Design a protein with these regions (language model features):
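Non-catalytic terminal extensions of PLP-dependent enzymes
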Residues: 35-196
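Glycine-rich phosphate-binding loop plus the immediately following alpha-helix
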Residues: 19
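A short, ordered amphipathic alpha-helix with a cationic face
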Residues: 12, 16, 133-134
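Conserved core segment of the aminotransferase class I/II
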Residues: 1-14, 22-34, 39, 118-127
């Protein structure tokens, strides 16, 4: 009788056994493989950061925003400004998690796109989604947020980097052929997005 009462307390009068079975399977998979899935997710985001930070053409138009860019120093006791520095390599994220009041989610990459002359929403909609089929969930005035997940593959990261390089090459060609007035207009748009 006690078991029946406890069981009825935690169940429904119309349970959906397919959903319950799916939740049980998902819980078991996370228990067995969750750490590896999340580790690969973070590695995908870190490789994205490294690829953008070390590619000379991408540096010209894009910047991965770091803890130092987004979190005031008084909230970063560890003193770590970036998870990845091209000169020094990787920093110990665990130190940030242990000491800092605020940290960035290592699985998300905030990319400043104002250097392209496009605002975040235009870059998301007209460039990434319409032209290349890349889905972005969050934007700001001059940034887009890439969110990796446990399904993010190396090939999807490579495709994104390839697309960013192609966009940068097209901008280079456009600016090479631009008149002085067109270049000034581009520079004003960039300044408006990045400095004002």
């Amino acid at each position: 009788q006690a078991f029946r009462e406890a069981y009825m307390t935690h169940t429904s009068t119309s349970p959906n056994y397919q959903i319950i079975a799916s939740l049980d399977v998902g819980r078991r998979q996370v228990e067995l493989e969750g750490f590896e899935f999340v580790q690969r997710q973070v590695e995908a985001a870190m490789s994205m950061r490294r690829a953008i930070a070390t590619h000379p053409l991408l540096q010209k138009y894009f910047k991965v925003l770091t803890s130092g860019d987004m979190i005031p120093e008084e909230h970063r006791e560890s003193g770590i400004k970036s998870y990845y520095n091209p000169d020094q390599g990787w920093n110990d994220i665990w130190e940030c998690w242990a000491k800092d009041e605020f940290v960035l989610d290592a699985s998300r990459v905030t990319l400043a796109v104002g250097g392209t002359g496009w605002d975040g929403d235009t870059f998301k909609t007209k460039i990434l989604m319409d032209k290349y089929g890349i889905q972005i969930n969050k934007t700001s005035r001059n940034t887009v947020l890439f969110m990796t997940n446990i399904g993010t593959t190396r090939s999807s990261v490579a495709y994104l980097i390839e697309v960013l390089v192609q966009i940068a090459q097209e901008l280079d060609e456009l600016l090479d052929d631009a008149s002085k007035m067109e270049r000034l207009s581009f520079e004003r748009r960039v300044k408006n997005l990045m400095e004002d």
